[in-house]
């Protein structure tokens, strides 16, 4: 029979692939060629050769009909595919089990969805990777000699070629398995205690068993923002959950009082994403007095490129099996009492894993040298963002309704124009066209025959990487500017863009305000790898709305204030729409808006990193850095270039693109100029200022080649795990400038807010902060702003050390009417 048989030492560790590669089929050997080299690279740092494993594969002979589905993870054990040829699948499973019996592995690494399904009855290998699992019950009963084999799922090797970050996770998973091939594994159920406190006596008994904790972890579960239970862990060994809604009535007064009194104690408290839990607990009258840590924030400080969810952190820092679907898979309708019991254990497990994770994270932070940065620059600004989240902006509802009428009319008019430009087609639904990537792709590439632009997309459920046609704004602008010559098609493409922008504006204007008439936002401190925040609607607030049929549904309150365009949306022809959107935001009676921002902050940092110190004075004296840059590109006297001239815009955008190593294609999207013209612009820019490439870019590339790590002046660290290609370098070029400016505004913002408790702070935008203050305190605020915001940045800690202290000047604008009418404050 034409089978691929396993090979390797008859001991210890078994490595099981799912479907062999073409080379493996050709040579009738598992784990050879590129796959073997990948595992060798992963294990190199551990000084372990994968050829010391017994290596085999699940599918030992070809099955042509299923080859494509298997490679794309589109299969399940006992699904339609397996049912189509059950004898084949059973044969493969029997052969693998026979190998297990012969080899008697202590640990088996399995790659692929189907082996996971078949051997453990688990689904979704991306969730279970890194877990330590047991074989399925029926296998353990039928074949008791292999009942103690530990199963550790790994992400399929073919997926790791596409995403280098996954190889780091695999290294951690392999390290865990190798450890337990040499020592005894004690199941977490035998090491940890998870209980439920149904009475105050239960809760006090738990507290007495650990009277002096180094820190405690608290976790809450919610339903529609109502607390359902609270979990506590004090020692990383035992955790307890307290039912909150479904307490027994006879225990409710004493148990609630016991919990509230305990939360009020100033014990150092740690949580996963504590901002949400603290916000909810504060709303319910139980604020946490001593917040000392957050596993999500520390995870971002340690490895900003990694996932930050508790499920991932559990997989790399603990031996606890993936459990985040335990409650979801059961469903409350199945058995309400069993559901509640499982929910409470799930809640306690969250508190337990958070405690275990944080202790190991602290050790990692000490080893990597970021513990001081975390304690001084990350956790202290937690309160700043909690305050911003609770502020919001007052909305002028009459102005909002006026703008809605205006932009709905604009959308209808442009949709009518679009219909008139196109012949009827059964594949186009005019009611859903603009918001449907599938229909827009059909219209652009099939109906009009435009040159195809595609991108790679990863299916978050299966991990499948597939190439899809691009229909986003950048792709359409690229077609308009560089790819399409037909003016009629360009007009259609431009109209699609315009309609999309109007649709986006309308959707934003329909964003629900809270019952107090204010629009809110919610900041995420781990928003980007650079340390910049991101923002979204509030997860802790929603409004009930009616649909067209009168049915009620929930809609989150708020929006990302960071993404609201200050000057509207720019169209390919350079015109603007939506430049009046901020008119809906008004100050409270007696208040004014005042916004301060760092002047050309990132460009100044790049200039320092480029060691072009002679250029720094031009940022603050005539003709100004952008006029000077424009003169390099268009020639002439920089003093004669006006801010309204197209040359000024070219200079401004060319500096941004040149600083971060962008190519002519990206600059073309930014400027709406042709690819050829942008090539010339960048050539002239780098010829006039070669220090950016020769000093700054060179230094970044050298640092990545030498250690893959960049450290900012404030001590923020990022390790780059991806391929060292042009995309990675571009990301690295922007890291230090963006991170430095963001951390500068945060350190100053924290002090500013502490010294102005009378001010409201609704928005932070990376290099700027908006405040709403009493009119009579304007001068006091300006003085505070200058005192806190214009502080020197020392580059001695930076990867690219520079002997200079950079002070970034700031600019202020203010308004008494609305946020759209900000004017310079002299």
Regions found by a protein language model. Name each.
Residues 36-40, 46, 120-138, 147-151, ...:
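Metal-dependent phosphoesterase core characteristic of DEDDh/y 3'-5' exonuclease domains
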Residues 230, 274-286, 296-303, 317, ...:
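Short active-site loop/helix that positions an aromatic residue
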Residues 1-184:
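A polyanion-binding, active-site-adjacent surface
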Residues 383-390, 516, 520-521, 525-528, ...:
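Conserved catalytic core of nucleic-acid polymerases
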Residues 106-112, 217, 267-277, 593-595:
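Acidic beta-strand-to-loop metal/phosphate-binding motif
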Residues 179-246, 263-265, 280, 305, ...:
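Conserved "right-hand" nucleotidyltransferase catalytic core of DNA-directed polymerases
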Residues 15-17, 216-219, 271, 292-293, ...:
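Short hydrophobic beta-strand that contains or immediately precedes a catalytic carboxylate
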Residues 284, 400-434, 438, 685-700, ...:
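Polymerase palm active-site segment centered on the conserved acidic dipeptide of motif C
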């Amino acid at each position: 029979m034409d089978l691929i048989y396993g090979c390797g030492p008859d001991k210890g560790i078994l490595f099981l692939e799912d479907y062999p590669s073409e080379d493996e089929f050709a040579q009738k050997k598992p784990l050879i060629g590129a796959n073997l080299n990948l595992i060798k690279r992963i294990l190199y740092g551990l000084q372990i050769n994968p050829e010391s494993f017994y290596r085999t594969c699940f599918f030992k002979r070809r099955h042509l009909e299923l080859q494509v589905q298997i490679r794309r993870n589109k299969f399940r054990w006992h699904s339609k595919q397996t049912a189509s040829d059950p004898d084949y699948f059973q044969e493969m499973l029997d052969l693998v089990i026979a190998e297990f019996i012969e080899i008697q592995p202590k640990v088996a690494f399995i790659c692929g969805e189907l082996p996971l399904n078949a051997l453990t009855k688990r689904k979704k290998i991306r969730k279970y990777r890194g877990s330590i699992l047991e074989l399925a019950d029926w296998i353990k009963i039928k074949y008791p000699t292999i009942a103690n084999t530990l199963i550790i799922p790994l992400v399929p090797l073919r997926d790791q070629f596409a995403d280098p970050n996954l190889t780091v996770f695999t290294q951690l998973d392999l390290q865990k398995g190798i450890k337990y091939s040499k020592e005894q594994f004690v199941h977490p159920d035998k090491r940890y205690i998870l209980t439920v406190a149904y009475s105050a006596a239960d809760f006090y008994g738990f507290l007495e068993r650990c009277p002096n904790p180094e820190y405690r972890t608290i976790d809450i579960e919610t339903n529609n923002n109502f607390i359902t239970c609270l979990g506590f862990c004090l020692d990383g060994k035992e955790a307890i959950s307290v039912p909150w809604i479904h307490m027994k009535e006879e225990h409710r007064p004493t148990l609630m009082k016991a919990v509230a009194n305990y939360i009020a104690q100033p014990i150092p408290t740690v949580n996963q994403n504590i901002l949400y839990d603290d916000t909810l607990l504060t709303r319910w009258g139980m604020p946490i007095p001593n917040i000392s840590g957050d596993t999500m924030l520390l995870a971002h400080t340690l490895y900003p490129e990694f996932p930050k969810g508790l499920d991932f952190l559990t997989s790399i820092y603990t031996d606890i099996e993936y459990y985040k679907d335990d409650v979801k898979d059961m469903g409350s309708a199945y058995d309400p009492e069993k559901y509640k019991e499982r929910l409470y254990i799930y809640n306690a497990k969250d508190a337990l894993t958070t405690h275990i994770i944080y202790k190991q994270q602290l050790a990692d932070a000490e080893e990597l040298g970021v513990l001081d940065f975390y304690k001084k620059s990350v956790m202290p600004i937690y309160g700043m963002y909690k305050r911003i989240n609770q502020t919001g902006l007052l909305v002028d509802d009459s102005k909002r309704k006026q703008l809605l009428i205006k932009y709905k009319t604009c959308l209808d008019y442009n949709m009518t124009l679009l219909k008139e430009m196109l012949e009827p087609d059964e594949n186009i639904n005019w009611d859903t066209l603009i918001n449907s990537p599938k229909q827009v792709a059909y219209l652009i590439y099939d109906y009009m025959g435009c040159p195809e632009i595609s991108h790679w997309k990863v299916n978050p459920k299966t991990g499948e990487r597939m190439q899809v046609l691009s229909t986003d704004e950048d792709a359409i602008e690229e077609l308009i500017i560089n790819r399409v010559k037909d003016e009629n098609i360009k007009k259609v493409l431009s109209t699609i863009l315009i309609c999309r922008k109007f649709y986006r504006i309308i959707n934003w204007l329909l964003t629900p305000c809270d019952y107090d008439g204010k629009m809110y936002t919610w900041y995420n401190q781990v928003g980007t790898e650079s340390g910049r925040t991101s923002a979204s609607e509030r997860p802790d607030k929603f409004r009930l709305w009616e649909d067209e049929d009168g049915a009620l549904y929930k809609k989150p309150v708020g929006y990302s204030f960071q993404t609201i365009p200050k000057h509207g949306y720019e169209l390919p022809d350079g015109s603007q729409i939506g430049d009046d959107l901020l008119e809906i935001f008004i100050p409270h009676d007696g208040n004014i808006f005042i916004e301060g921002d760092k002047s050309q902050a990132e460009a100044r940092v790049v200039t320092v990193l480029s060691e072009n110190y002679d250029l720094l004075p031009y940022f603050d004296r005539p003709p100004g850095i952008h006029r000077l840059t424009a003169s390099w590109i268009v020639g002439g006297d920089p003093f004669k270039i006006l801010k309204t001239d197209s040359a000024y815009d070219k200079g401004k955008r060319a500096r941004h693109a040149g600083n971060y190593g962008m190519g002519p294609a990206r600059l073309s999207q930014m400027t709406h100029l042709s690819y050829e013209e942008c090539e010339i612009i960048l050539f002239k820019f780098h010829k006039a200022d070669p220090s950016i490439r020769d000093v700054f870019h060179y230094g970044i590339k050298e640092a990545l080649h030498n250690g893959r790590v960049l450290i900012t002046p404030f001590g923020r660290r990022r390790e780059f795990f991806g391929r060292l290609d042009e995309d990675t370098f571009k990301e690295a070029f922007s890291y230090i400038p963006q991170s430095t400016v963001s951390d500068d505004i945060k350190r100053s913002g924290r002090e500013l807010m502490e010294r102005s408790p009378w001010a409201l702070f609704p928005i932070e935008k990376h290099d700027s902060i908006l405040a709403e203050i009493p009119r009579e305190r304007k001068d006091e605020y300006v003085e505070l702003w200058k005192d806190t915001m214009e502080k020197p940045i020392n580059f001695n800690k930076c990867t690219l050390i520079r002997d200079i202290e950079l002070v970034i000047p700031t600019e202020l604008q203010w308004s008494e009417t609305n946020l759209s009418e900000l004017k310079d404050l002299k």
